[in-house]
């Protein structure tokens, strides 16, 4: 959950830590040290919302960051839905990264075809299946949005796709 935190922490014992520049530098150093083909970079969701960057720039900077950092795949989090499905679809269309979420059916919505249940990545000659799962968002996402989503329990779906990917 990066929640649009572009800048490092400003105060307290974590002052100066975090932020996109620091994250990117660390990720690049790991890719250099271990070889980029040996590093799998995933985002578990909630890259949206949380600071004025999201509010003022409409979520575009977060998409640019995910693309620039060359994530291998991202999952959706509940805050990705804060501005509605159509707006989320607009942002997802601008991602150069596979978006995965297996336990919601987006058929018939603006996200139809943009979000896959899983992706198979290849790193260091090995195929790796990445399944995206999202918690039940009914208590934290606007009811009008939730009514457009078909939710399935993550454990059931994870087991189903694990069998498919074996």
Model-derived segments and their meaning:
Residues 2-166:
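Acidic, metal/ion-coordinating pockets
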